[in-house]
Amino acid sequence: MENSENVPSYDQNINFTPNLTRDQEHVIMVSALQQVISNVGGDTNSNAWEADLPPLNAGPCPLCSVTGCYGCVFPRHEAIIKKEKKHKGVRKKPSGKWAAEIWDPSLKVRRWLGTFPTAEMAAKAYNDAAAEFVGRRSARRGTKNGEEASTKKTTEKN
């Protein structure tokens, strides 16, 4: 059985002042948090990132303007934050494969180009289809393979 002297009971008179102002509560909480963050009275083991932190009284953070801010100075892990490159007409399916679609201006519909194991392969399919549309459009205008019409006329005169 536990020693009843070590277990506080609810009927004991606890020294606490319920009539604190908000400012007084704020000062107490900030002081407690500063002690926890600065590890006052705790173990002496330190992590490598603790050396990069500014002291608590360093003034406002240059990024967020909060006094004593530690969130903005933590090193960012680029491997975790690494974003996937976005390609036009390419999206990732729930299965993990990459799908490519393109708008066909002549039919006024989306044309399905297929699914691919990588985003780069899907982007290549999109680029090939886009080049085909450009070639088709320029052929309608009387040019071949995207050549400028004015260039063709000047070469015929020579």
UniProtKB/Swiss-Prot annotation:
It comes from the Eukaryota. Disulfide bonds: none annotated. GO terms for molecular function: DNA binding; DNA-binding transcription factor activity. Residues 134-158 are annotated as: Disordered. Residues 86-147 bind DNA. GO terms for biological process: ethylene-activated signaling pathway. It is found in: Nucleus. GO terms for cellular component: nucleus. InterPro entries: AP2/ERF_dom (IPR001471), AP2/ERF_dom_sf (IPR036955), AP2/ERF_ERF_subfamily (IPR050913), DNA-bd_dom_sf (IPR016177). Keywords: Activator, DNA-binding, Ethylene signaling pathway, Nucleus, Transcription, Transcription regulation. Coiled coil: none annotated. PROSITE patterns: AP2_ERF. Residues 144-158 have a biased composition (Basic and acidic residues). Probably acts as a transcriptional activator. Binds to the GCC-box pathogenesis-related promoter element. May be involved in the regulation of gene expression by stress factors and by components of stress signal transduction pathways. Belongs to the AP2/ERF transcription factor family. ERF subfamily. This is Ethylene-responsive transcription factor ERF120.
